A protein has these predicted regions:
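Short, well-ordered strand-loop elements centered on a beta-strand within folded domains, enriched
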Residues: 1, 46-51
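Intrinsically disordered, low-complexity acidic Ser/Thr-rich regulatory segments
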Residues: 1-30, 42, 82, 92
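Short solvent-exposed loop/turn micro-motifs enriched in small/polar/acidic residues
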Residues: 2, 32-34, 69-70
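A generic structural motif
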Residues: 14, 22-24, 34-36, 45-46, ...
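Surface-exposed loop and edge beta-strand positions of immunoglobulin-like domains
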Residues: 30-32, 51
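C-terminal boundary/linker segments immediately following FHA domains
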Residues: 49, 54, 60-92
Length: 92
């Protein structure tokens, strides 16, 4: 994350985690360009992904907007004006 949250690590500790500014979000971020339920970050048993949940300002990975995108270490997720850098766990 950039700004106040820069360097903060947020583990995805469940299969489906909603990111948004609404009370029901698992990761609550009070940024005006983020929708109440903006996107979900999760794991489907095969890959980590981010999925837009019909947000107003969209969700992009590495500058490309798609409804759902598989994630890799080093990817940049953009939710409104917020940018997140992806670091995936090592597979042993």
């Amino acid at each position: 994350m950039q700004g106040f949250f820069e360097g903060l690590e947020l583990p995805v500790d469940r299969d489906w985690m909603v990111v948004g500014r609404g009370r029901g979000a698992d990761l609550l971020i009070t940024e005006p360009t983020i929708s109440r339920a903006h996107a979900a970050i999760g794991f489907d048993g095969e890959e980590f992904f981010v999925e837009d949940l019909g947000s107003t300002n969209g969700t992009a990975v590495n500058g490309k907007r798609k409804p759902r995108t598989a994630l890799n270490t080093g990817d940049e997720i953009q939710l409104g004006k917020l940018r997140l850098r992806v670091t995936l766990p090592s597979v042993r």
